[in-house]
Amino acid sequence: FLSISLLILSGELIFLLPYVLARVFRPIFLEVFNLNNLQLGTLFSVYGTVALLSYVYGGVISDRFQPKKLIAISLFCTALGGVVLASYPSYFILKILYGYWGLTTVFLFWGAMIKATRVWGGLYNQGKAFAFLDCGRGLVAASMVSLGVLIFSIFLISDIETSNLIEQK
């Protein structure tokens, strides 16, 4: 069960930066990066467009290379994007970053995760394998968001309404 547990964990953690962060902490994300809702929507559109195109070729690449190598590379590359995000980049750089994440999370990762899950399930347990994967990802997502909100509330010096931008960063 170690393999499927790692797939579950990586399958959710890789989407933390491009999806979860901006969704859960939307008002703060908008303020910290000096964005409006239209600009955030544009970032998600850039991500979605690159991801859509990446699905086509991601399956091909997952057949040519070992899934565990692709997963490791995609996690590392996505984390590098997190380093860029931590530097509070401009809107232009954010658009490039979200396109980059479309490549790292879908082109490199998604097909490899699906293939690794299929291999783990074997010939007769595909349904169980994908049920474990999706159920586990949902549980990990709920846990991460709850933990994130708890940590955020602990470190927030004052009420969110009266906190300044420096406290939110």
Regions inferred by a protein language model and the residue ranges of each:
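Pair of pore-lining "gating" transmembrane helices in MFS-fold secondary transporters
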Residues: 1-24
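Glycine-rich segments within core transmembrane alpha-helices of 12-TM secondary carriers
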Residues: 130-153
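Intracellular juxtamembrane helix-capping segments at the cytosolic ends
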Residues: 108-122
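C-terminal ends and interior cores of transmembrane alpha-helices
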Residues: 76-90
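Hydrophobic core of transmembrane alpha-helices in multi-pass small-molecule transporters
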Residues: 81, 92-108
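Membrane-interface helix caps of multi-pass secondary transporters
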Residues: 20-34
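Central cavity-lining transmembrane alpha-helices of secondary-active solute carriers
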Residues: 42-60
